[in-house]
Structures are given as structure tokens and as C-alpha cells.
Curated annotation (Swiss-Prot):
GO biological process: nitrate assimilation
Free-text function comment from the UniProt entry: Nitrate reductase is a key enzyme involved in the first step of nitrate assimilation. Catalyzes the reduction of nitrate to nitrite, using ferredoxin as the electron donor. Can use reduced methyl viologen but neither NADPH nor NADH as electron donors.
Similarity comment: family membership: Belongs to the prokaryotic molybdopterin-containing oxidoreductase family. NasA/NapA/NarB subfamily.
Cofactor(s) essential for the protein: [4Fe-4S] cluster; Mo-bis(molybdopterin guanine dinucleotide)
pH dependence: Optimum pH is 9.
Taxonomic source organism: Haloferax mediterranei (strain ATCC 33500 / DSM 1411 / JCM 8866 / NBRC 14739 / NCIMB 2177 / R-4) (Halobacterium mediterranei)
Binding, [4Fe-4S] cluster: C22, C25, C29, C59
One Pfam short name: Molybdopterin
UniProt-listed InterPro entries: Asp_de-COase-like_dom_sf (IPR009010), MoPterin_dinucl-bd_dom (IPR006657), Mopterin_OxRdtase (IPR006656), Mopterin_OxRdtase_4Fe-4S_dom (IPR006963), Nitr_red_NasA (IPR054894), Prok_molybdopt-oxidoreductase (IPR050123)
Description of what induces expression: Repressed by the presence of ammonium as nitrogen source.
Protein name as it appears in the record: Assimilatory nitrate reductase
Inhibition and activation profile: Inhibited by cyanide and azide.
Length: 708
């Protein structure tokens, strides 16, 4: 019996086949769920042949994690008594949460931090953002989507005036070149990668990544760029296009601005290629790819850097300069979590609902009127991002479907802040963060929930319950509404809340915006399965290419109506290697892992496995213990030390240490430095060294800190 059948029962349950949306990644595949007849949970999961996104295709991991997640379920509210978490009633738990938030708000609304997630439904995300901004009034509101997507979002806004990817899945079959940069869709987006490989059969698939990933292993070519060298490589390619007269001059002059400023700041091809760690021939070959209709995909390898916005902008620059913005072309950011897009559109920390500019007075008034609160109640800036939020040491932290104790960079520092705060954790699974909580609120997961989600190509789909919510567990939306009733009465309906009513409220607030969802309703989604925004009318949706074929004109939602080239030059890497820390640590996904691993691992392994090149092992053999062929060392950064098992792997270049993002200890090592434009952390690069596991690792670490 699947482990997510939480309680055996003989009561009646939903047993019909229920169409819904996969909760694993942002491809947004339609699923069909069948609830169990004799228990709470899902009996079977399969792809939905009627869903327009995937037409029945589904990856094994999405099916497996929907039907049988490996995490430990939360089943009752918990509160901390005498240092221990003990079961309590919902009324007691909610009374504690409400009273504590009210007390903090009376002192300063910014004493309350609210952290949401790309795992929420649109409705829960919208309600949480409304409560945080208009009820609590805090600027310290964000979601874990900023940890992975903020740099791409910021680059899109800077280029197009909107966080709306120009390409859609419809473009994949029409592209002749698929340039995958700092992403691993073979692991992270298997269904989408199947489409990419099918299209590349008659074209080219090229991967830019320091590591030979699963995607790179089946590509036509793999460019092993130096860690942190992505921006330099993109600039080298653009410089080559300029030097060889391969710019689409007509498109650039008519539809863009800022090109001359970019060109004047470009380094020479030779200098940029050297910084990227590639040959001049490689630059020439990559530039030649752009002659054909090209989709440039990128992911966390680009975004999670102090240079993330600059690098994503440089990739957009390549599309603009080469005219790759029509069918079968364009800059395509690959979103990770299932509802990252929805979290941004519904309640983004950087904009109001519907991409309304946060600091624009007209939009602030419109939001205040829609929410029936004074404009003065709304915070006057969008906040410092997740890392900055914890740096401010709020007295109350409320997390919803996220695990900051394992997911934040410099996790030890995050632990100290969370330990000193009144911590409220709302989740379906027992996460690392739960262990520090003062109150734990058990929430329903997707197979038990009603709502909607948005995938990476802006398509809205329904999430439907195929099983009842177990006793002791509540819907995210109802929990948020209960807190609102205690903190800001009247702001949200009292639970139980109608998800469709909340969606209608959200959709109405998007009317006239670039993310117009006002033509989408539950009734429409019940009939069509999925609708792509902008959809301003009940029978409309859009490809959103910023192009009107009836007039042959490009129009972008920028002040000038033109797309903008990025002139950002990027930040220096915060931790270049040196004599004390000669190795570079990077992080990445594994095929069977998900985020911090809460729902994809049943037991925490004793120590993570670090993939390293055999040459690296040989170079630092004095710091490696070999016990009957098992290699172990201690990885030490400027923040922490972690014992690891070494996996000799030729796919990882010499000098690089690769750790999985799914292990809860990984982010003890990573740097809290953030991109100054997006506030996204620099997860993909920090300096480390190896220390023999029998050495006093902690003392070694402290000594290093003193000497720095």
C-alpha cells in the first residue's frame, strides 16, 4: 500500500478518476488521479491524454512522487512545550499564531516575516500575499521562488517590461538549434526534454555547463564553461556576432534600444573567451548556431549567481541581436517548481498581483481599493529578498510549504535566526525546519487540494482533490484565512474558503495588465483543461510574442515600446579560489531528488556524496581517507565543514566539487552573497578545500576563519 495512504478508514472517499496537474516540476503536465477506496491517499496516477500540455505523457518521477512521496506526513497540529513538539488542537495552535503575530505587528509589521513557496496553489499564494501585505503590512514577504527564479524574472523585466517568457512549448518543434545553458532538463523536466530531443533529431542540441550532465551526455556538443564564466562566454559570442556582421540590424534598429551601449562595453572575443575558459573556435561555433531558428534555455546554473541577472540578460541579448524572437526561437527560462510562475503572478514580492509595478502609485491605489484597505497600509517597498529577510532577524517567521533550514544559503546562520524567532511552519511533510518550530500547522498536499497552478509557459491548469483531507489536516487556503481572521478580520473570507472565489478575485485584479487572467475561470478550465495567459476575454488566450501579425509590428510593455538590451556587467564572484580554498563547490539536482529532499527521501543519509574528478582526488589525496575503496573527506568552506563520501566522476571537471541540492547539509557550505538586482543567492559557486576526516575539522575551520 502506498505510504501516502495516511489513515486506514472505511468511510466513503472520492474514487472516480480526477483530472489534475502534476506537482513535481513546472512543465505542468496533466495527470489523472484515482483516490483509494479504503484510505486517504492516491491509488493510481497517470498522464492525462486530454490535457493540452502533455497529451498523456508523464514522467515516472512525477507519477511516483504524486502517488507515493517518501516524506514523513504531518497529521496533527504541534506546539512546543518544554522544548518538545507535542500534539495540540487546531484552536490552540491558531490562537498562539494569531496572538503572536498581532503582538509583533503592534510593535512593527516588519517584525513578521512570511515565506511562501512555488508549491502552493495560485489561490493560496494570492491569499498569503494579500494577508502579508495588506493584513500584516510587512515588507518581509517573499517565496522560495526567489531562491531559484528571481534573476530570470528580473532579466525578463529589464528586457521586455514583463515576466512573460516569449517562447512556449509550441516553439520547440520549430526550433533548429536548442542551446541549453546552465540547465539539466533531462533530469529536471523529463517530458519537456523528450520534446527537445525529438526536435533536435533534425537540428542541434548543444549544452553549456561546467559539468557533463545527463542532458550534456546526449547532446551533439557540450561546452564545459568555467564555473562563473557564463557571462563572459555570452559576451564573447555577442562580440563575435558584432565583429563578423551577423547582427540582425533591421530588427535591432526598429525594435530595440541600448544596443550601441552594450557593444561599446563588450570585451574582445579573446579576453572574454579566456575568462570563460573556452577556445576561440568554441565561441565561433556557438555564434554560428544562432544563424538558425534558436531556442536558448537556461536554468539555475545561470540564475543562482551574483551575476545571474546580468547573465540571463546577456542570453536575452543574444536572441535580440540575432533576431531570434519569432516562432521557434527565443529566450526560455526553465522554471523549477510546479507553481513558481503562479506564485510570481499572484503575489510576487517584487510586484502586485498581475505584474502590477510595486512602487507605481496608480497600481498601489488599485490594489488598495480592490483589497479595501488604505494605501498607507501597504508597505512602500517590496522587501530585501529571502536572505535579507532573515538578516533582519524578525521576531516571527511563518513558512508555508518551504524548508529554509535546508534551502537557504549559509544554513547555519539561517538556523540561528529561526531558532531565535517564533517560528510557524505550515507544511504537509516533516521538514528540517519543523524541528525548530514553535507551532506546526499540517497542510493538505496537492492530491487533497483544490485550486490552480501556472506552468513555465504561462498556462493555467486546475488542481483537483482525488481524496479527502485526513482528520487533523487543513487546506493551505483555509489555514491562511484562519490566520487572517485573527490578524486582519474581514480581509479574507472565513474558512472554509471557496478556491474559485479567490481565483476570481485574483483574476479580476489582473484585468488590463500584461498578465491578464480576467478571461479565465474555473468553468472555463473545466471545459478546456488549460488556458494560457494573457487571456482578457472568456474565449481568448495568447502566444504572447509581443508581436501583432495583423500589423507586422513588435510592441513591448516598456516605456518606449521597445525591447531593451542589458548593459549589466555583473558582480565579481564573491569567493574566487585561493591558496586556502583551492576548490570550487557547485550544487545541482539529482534525478530522483526534489528541492531539499523532504518528499523525495525517506531517511536522511549520514553524509552527502560529493562528485569530483579523479584528478582532483589524486591531487588532494592527503586529505582523503580510503577505507576498503570508500573515499571520504571533509569539505570546508568559510562558513562550515561537512563530511562527505567521494564519488570519482569524470563528468565533473578538475577543481570542481559537486554536491546535491537535496541533502540538508549542502547549504551549510554555500555563500549568502546575492545578486544585487534580483536578491537571488550565489548557490552555484563558493570556495572550499578538503580536510582529512580524521583531522579536527571544526578546529581547522575556526583556525581558517581567524587567519582570513
Amino acid at each position: 500500500m502506498p505510504r501516502n495512504l495516511r489513515f486506514l478508514s472505511v468511510v466513503n472517499h472520492v474514487t472516480k478518476q480526477v483530472p489534475t496537474t502534476c506537482m513535481r516540476c513546472a512543465v505542468g503536465c496533466g495527470h489523472v488521479h484515482l483516490g483509494s477506496e479504503n484510505a486517504y491517499g492516491l491509488e493510481t496516477v497517470r498522464g492525462d491524454p486530454s490535457h493540452p500540455v502533455n497529451n498523456g505523457l508523464a514522467c515516472g518521477r512525477g507519477i511516483r512522487e504524486s502517488a507515493d512521496p517518501a516524506g514523513e506526513w504531518l497529521t496533527r497540529p504541534l506546539v512546543r512545550e518544554d522544548g518538545e513538539l507535542v500534539q495540540t488542537s487546531w484552536s490552540d495552535a491558531m490562537a498562539r499564531v494569531g496572538a503572536t503575530i498581532r503582538t509583533a505587528v503592534a510593535t512593527d509589521p516588519d517584525e513578521v516575516a512570511v515565506l511562501g513557496s512555488g508549491q502552493q496553489t495560485n489561490e493560496a499564494a494570492y491569499a498569503l500575499g494579500k494577508l502579508a501585505r495588506a493584513g500584516i503590512g510587512t515588507r518581509n514577504y517573499d517565496a522560495n521562488t526567489t531562491l531559484c527564479m528571481a534573476s530570470a524574472v528580473t532579466a525578463y523585466y529589464r528586457a521586455f517590461g514583463s515576466d512573460a517568457p516569449p517562447p512556449t512549448y509550441d516553439d520547440i518543434p520549430n526550433a533548429e538549434t536548442h542551446l541549453v545553458w546552465g540547465a539539466n532538463p533531462a533530469v529536471a523536466h523529463p517530458v519537456m526534454f523528450r520534446w527537445i530531443r525529438q526536435s533536435a533529431t533534425d537540428g542541434r542540441l548543444v549544452v553549456v555547463d561546467p559539468v557533463e550532465t545527463k542532458t550534456a551526455a546526449v547532446a551533439d556538443d557540450h561546452v564545459s564553461v568555467a564555473p562563473g564564466g557564463d557571462l563572459a562566454l555570452a559576451r564573447a559570442i555577442l562580440r563575435h556576432l558584432v565583429d563578423t556582421d551577423q547582427i540582425d540590424e533591421s530588427f535591432v534598429r526598429s525594435n530595440t534600444e541600448g544596443f550601441d551601449d552594450v557593444v561599446s562595453a563588450l570585451p574582445s572575443v579573446t579576453d572574454a573567451a579566456a575568462r570563460a575558459g573556452v577556445s576561440l573556435d568554441t565561441v565561433e561555433e556557438l555564434a554560428a548556431l544562432l544563424d538558425a531558428p534558436t531556442l536558448i534555455y537556461w536554468g539555475m546554473g545561470v540564475n543562482q549567481s551574483v551575476r545571474g541577472t546580468a547573465t540571463a540578460g546577456a542570453l536575452v541579448n543574444l536572441c535580440l541581436a540575432s533576431g531570434n524572437l519569432g516562432p521557434g526561437t527565443g529566450p526560455f527560462s526553465l522554471t523549477g517548481q510546479a507553481n513558481s510562475m503562479g506564485t510570481r503572478v499572484c503575489s510576487s514580492k517584487g510586484t502586485w498581483s498581475g505584474h502590477r509595478p510595486f512602487e507605481h502609485p496608480d497600481h498601489r491605489r488599485a490594489v488598495a481599493e480592490a483589497w479595501d484597505v488604505p494605501v498607507s497600509r501597504l508597505p512602500d517597498d517590496s522587501g530585501p529578498g529571502p536572505v535579507g529577510i532573515l538578516d533582519s532577524s524578525p521576531s516571527v517567521v511563518w513558512t508555508v510549504a518551504t524548508n529554509p533550514l535546508a534551502g537557504f544559503p549559509d544554513a547555519t546562520a539561517a538556523r540561528e535566526v529561526l531558532r531565535d524567532s517564533f517560528l510557524v511552519v505550515q507544511d504537509a511533510f516533516r521538514s528540517d525546519t519543523v524541528e525548530l518550530a514553535d507551532v506546526v500547522l499540517p497542510a493538505a498536499t496537492w492530491g487533497e487540494s483544490e485550486g490552480t497552478a501556472m506552468n513555465m509557459e504561462r498556462t493555467v491548469s486546475r488542481i483537483r482533490a482525488a481524496t479527502e483531507t485526513p482528520p487533523g489536516v487543513r487546506q493551505d487556503l483555509d489555514i491562511i484565512a484562519d490566520v487572517a481572521a485573527r490578524v486582519a478580520p474581514g480581509l479574507l473570507p472565513r474558512p472554509p474558503v471557496s478556491p474559485s472565489a479567490i481565483f476570481d478575485e485574483f483574476a479580476a485584479l489582473t484585468e488590463g495588465t500584461d498578465a491578464d487572467c480576467s478571461g479565465i475561470s474555473y468553468t472555463r478550465l473545466d471545459g478546456e483543461r488549460a488556458v494560457r495567459w494573457p487571456a482578457p476575454e472568456p474565449n481568448s488566450d495568447a502566444g504572447y510574442r509581443y508581436y501583432d501579425p495583423s500589423t507586422s509590428r513588435w510592441t513591448f510593455p516598456t516605456p518606449s515600446g521597445k525591447a531593451r538590451f542589458s548593459t549589466l556587467d555583473g558582480e565579481p564572484l564573491p569567493e574566487p579560489v585561493d591558496g586556502d580554498y583551492p576548490l570550487t563547490l557547485t550544487t545541482g539536482r539529482e534525478a530522483d531528488g526534489y528541492n531539499t529532499g523532504v518528499r523525495s527521501r525517506s531517511d536522511t543519509p549520514e553524509e552527502p556524496v560529493a562528485r569530483v574528478n579523479p584528478e582532483t582526488v589524486d591531487t588532494y589525496h592527503d586529505a582523503v581517507a580510503d577505507t576498503d575503496g570508500e573515499l571520504r573527506t571533509t569539505v570546508v568552506s568559510r562558513r562550515a565543514s561537512v563530511s562527505v563520501t567521494l564519488d570519482r566522476d569524470d563528468a565533473v571537471p578538475p577543481g570542481l566539487v559537486w554536491l546535491s541540492i537535496h541533502h540538508p547539509m549542502t547549504n551549510q557550505l554555500t555563500s549568502p552573497a546575492v545578486d544585487p538586482q534580483s536578491n537571488e543567492p550565489n548557490f552555484k559557486q563558493c570556495a572550499v578545500r578538503f580536510v582529512h576526516p580524521d583531522a579536527p575539522a571544526k578546529a581547522d575551520f575556526l583556525a581558517a576563519e581567524v587567519s582570513d
